[in-house]
């Protein structure tokens, strides 16, 4: 249960598995907030304090589900009109959410779980591929949408690109 935009300040069930794409409560901020995965940090901190494996199990299950069910828009031409249509709308892949995911939630997954059984093997490979995909989207499409580099969204998107580079310096 999370309190998110559109829920009237009341905790709402986001699904098990999480429904990442359905716009609920007639508020686009709800979908965007769910896809920022801000609740992961609290679970990772709880794991660090308690050692209770239910927390990283839930975070990695949600991450695996998101990667499997929310593919990046494919074959988007590198022009401003197509970039806006693909990455500046109510979807899990709106550029602002792509950036925020990298520095606010996926960075925390990397920070807390790297070197553990929770982020190893094939799961780490899927995670690294998804981070690289996020970095590609941010590096190609954010400058197309904000060509004058004059928008606060671009700052958060570029911060996401920085954190993606910090997570995968050899990619």
Regions found by a protein language model. Name each.
Residues 10-11, 17, 27-171:
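Aromatic-lined, polymer-binding surfaces characteristic
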Residues 1-20:
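Low-complexity, Ser/Thr/Pro/Gly-enriched N-terminal "stalk/linker" regions
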């Amino acid at each position: 249960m999370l309190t998110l935009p559109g829920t009237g300040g009341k905790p709402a069930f986001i699904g098990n598995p999480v429904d990442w794409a359905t716009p609920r409560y007639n508020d686009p901020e709800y979908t965007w907030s769910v896809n920022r995965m801000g609740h992961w940090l609290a679970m990772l901190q709880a794991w660090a304090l308690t050692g209770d494996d239910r927390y990283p199990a839930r975070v990695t299950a949600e991450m695996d589900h998101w990667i499997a069910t929310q593919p990046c828009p494919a074959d988007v031409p590198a022009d401003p009109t197509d970039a806006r249509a693909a990455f500046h709308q109510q979807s899990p892949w709106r550029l602002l959410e792509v950036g925020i995911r990298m520095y606010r939630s996926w960075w925390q997954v990397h920070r807390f779980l790297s070197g553990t059984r929770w982020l190893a093997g094939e799961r780490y490979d899927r995670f690294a591929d998804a981070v690289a995909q996020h970095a590609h989207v941010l590096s190609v499409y954010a400058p197309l949408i904000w060509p004058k580099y004059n928008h606060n969204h671009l700052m958060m998107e570029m911060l996401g690109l920085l954190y993606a580079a910090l997570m995968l310096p050899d990619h």
